Amino acid sequence: MSEITLGRYLFERLNQVDVKTIFGLPGDFNLSLLDKIYEVEGMRWAGNANELNAAYAADGYARIKGMSCIITTFGVGELSALNGIAGSYAEHVGVLHVVGVPSISSQAKQLLLHHTLGNGDFTVFHRMSANISETTAMVTDIATAPAEIDRCIRTTYITQRPVYLGLPANLVDLKVPAKLLETPIDLSLKPNDPEAETEVVDTVLELIKAAKNPVILADACASRHDVKAETKKLIDATQFPSFVTPMGKGSIDEQHPRFGGVYVGTLSRPEVKEAVESADLILSVGALLSDFNTGSFSYSYKTKNIVEFHSDYIKIRNATFPGVQMKFALQKLLNAVPEAIKGYKPVPVPARVPENKSCDPATPLKQEWMWNQVSKFLQEGDVVITETGTSAFGINQTPFPNNAYGISQVLWGSIGFTTGACLGAAFAAEEIDPKKRVILFIGDGSLQLTVQEISTMIRWGLKPYLFVLNNDGYTIERLIHGEKAGYNDIQNWDHLALLPTFGAKDYENHRVATTGEWDKLTQDKEFNKNSKIRMIEVMLPVMDAPTSLIEQAKLTASINAKQE
């Protein structure tokens, strides 16, 4: 085979970088492209219920596998995906957005085609995507098309940001040399400037030598930019107390003896707040300092000795070193750390979150008790997905087992995101290890935005746990403003009718309302095997919420009300 179609070239390249599942919807400008998926062994087309859900699914898949691909059609399809793509941009998730666009000749003639604005402007939607993409490409020349595809895939992976790739309908069947596939896409980072890297490492080593009470704080980009291994080695080598932010959940081993808890500024447990804020050196890995990730910017460090390791720069106190990538800098730092910590005497880490006290099994479920108890259900390697709202805050008090991965859209916060993300994560988990469990916690209100994607889970035989927290509406919004306002009410659904309604045959339904019912279900051996899709409706009081969310809601309401 000396030549292959451009469409097949795209999917062969994605297959080479371990993207096996493609998300999206068919439309007449991408149909010929979609044909080529079935020509590549091991590739599959998920086929989503709508483009927004497809974007969410691509995000969830990419968080587990490193990058993903969504395919939409020109105009109506691509615009429906943009909320999800914007979330991936905000949260550093590598999603390749491929858009099937009208033929080059149709564009040149400015034909009044369907899915256009009727004004002959065929670049308007491309321009809309530009501000939420790391880079964009509109392929117009078959000779350079393979190189453009390679560039887009590399950029998606390296930067962990969305990339837009427009493919005209008339080009995807044209042939390109198959030999090009023999040279793998280079997914490696370019080395740091040696002088700048050495200055960074030497400066950090001096700070470490002088520190008596240093801490390590792991955040979102420790996972997104692939430095989890380096961060673990840093903790092991230094024995410094180590903490995560809400967006950093799962980035380090929470069962490690030097793990101290989740730091969220004023919303932290008092002992965690004291441990972090009294440190004389803070090594911050992959920080993403958003409001809900910092307790509304309530970090209150006493020290000025703060080192921020980022994907493309490092900041030490007030000095910034642009272009110095944390992955290589951490690796070089690790080589010299043993000598630098010779004088360090480990300080105690905060005590673990205490277990729930025994109570009457008939006690009605409440959020504080439930989130403490969730940790007993979790297993090593689980993917834990928590929706914006009570779930995203409650999970902060749930210790993760080793190698668990947390997914929560703390920065972008688009409600309903996690249903689609659960689908994508379930595909990814199945590809990595069919025994790997995917567990979703979502509110009844959020579920109503994206519930259709459960049907896609059923269609593909995926087996996630779907915990629906039924607290009769938008509790997080009620806490911020409008406790009894009608706009925070929703229609009550029969959640246990959803799986059979969507055509499930092998499934389980459960409803739990008491502590005894929760324990009986989550401790059941068969229930703990991911052998089928499960819907678990969790009955909770309307205004019940984790303490941290109640406090965050007060902070948010105060900020929203400020006049200047």
UniProtKB/Swiss-Prot annotation:
Similarity comment: Belongs to the TPP enzyme family.
GO cellular component: cell surface; cytosol; fungal biofilm matrix; nucleus
Keyword Lyase tagged: yes
EC class of the enzyme, as a word: lyase
The keyword Metal-binding is annotated on this UniProt entry: yes
Domain of life: Eukaryota
Positions that bind Mg(2+): D444, N471, G473
Spans traversing the lipid bilayer: none
Complex and partners: Homotetramer.
Protein name in the entry: Pyruvate decarboxylase
Catalytic activity: a 2-oxocarboxylate + H(+) = an aldehyde + CO2; pyruvate + H(+) = acetaldehyde + CO2
Keywords: Decarboxylase, Lyase, Magnesium, Metal-binding, Thiamine pyrophosphate
Cofactor or coenzyme needed: Mg(2+); thiamine diphosphate
CDD domains per record: TPP_PDC_IPDC, TPP_PYR_PDC_IPDC_like
Cofactor: binding details: Binds 1 Mg(2+) per subunit. Binds 1 thiamine pyrophosphate per subunit.
Example of a GO MF term: magnesium ion binding
Binding site for thiamine diphosphate: T390, G413, S414, I415, G445, S446, N471, D472, G473, Y474, T475, I476
Biological processes per GO annotation: aromatic amino acid family catabolic process to alcohol via Ehrlich pathway; pyruvate metabolic process
Enzyme Commission (EC) number: 4.1.1.1
UniProt cross-references to Gene3D superfamilies, sorted A to Z: 3.40.50.970, TPP-binding domain (3.40.50.1220)
Chain sites annotated for binding pyruvate: D28, H115, E477
